[in-house]
Amino acid sequence: KGIALKVIPMNEKGELEMDKFRELFSDRTRLVSVTHVSNVLGTINPVKAMIEEAHKHDVPVLIDGAQAVPHLAVDVQDLDAEFYVFSGHKVYGPTGIGVLYGKEEWLDKLPPYQGGGEMISTVSFEKTTFNELPFKFEAGTPDYIGSTALAEALRYVNHLGMENIAAYEDELLRYATEKLNAIEGMRIFGQAAHKGAVLSFLVGNIHHYDMGMLLDRLGIAVRTGHHCAQPLMQALGIEGTVRASFSFYNTKEEIDTFAAGIERVRKMF
């Protein structure tokens, strides 16, 4: 209530317009919140430059890194954002767990969102004193199984090397883009110069749900719909897309199968 949202415009390639971003600041700006990598278009946003611009206006920044952390080397110290968040399952860990990184000075200001054991220092009928960081945010018995599994997943990808993962996935993206562009009626959404290994597309007049369902019958896993980004779909003038997301365990042979599957579905309509 009382909060006004200002949306950063994007160009036809799916890139944020930095000039217009700079014009959005005013003395009432309290927070900049932006995704590091679009889970729909794959656009890698220039978050470091955006953080620097926000700090010129003394505005804190929250970065959603759910689509970035599994695919890019992320250094929160270098980015200098006040907050950086990501989910566990997208980085090959378990579901139901995520990470909030925050600068200590900001986390100290935030009240606990949940009560329970370990998150208090002293308690009486008159008042409660909260525990120090990070314990004031960890009420009750923690999900130590989930956190242990997530830590192991992070160790695994770091062992592979995030630079190696990013380079290989970029090779897959370029190969897949070339293969899909050769398909009649193909429309790929998101043509940013800096892009993660995500392809959102439509083929002719085939509904995205139909394409996804038929690809599933061929053993090809994709996502369909608005991908939790309805305002983006409205901006693109569509209801949804088919989305393929590539990872380090995918191969060019699988992309060949994927492209052949799309072509097979296309010929059904």
Positions of PLM-derived features:
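Pyridoxal 5′-phosphate
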Residues: K1-F269
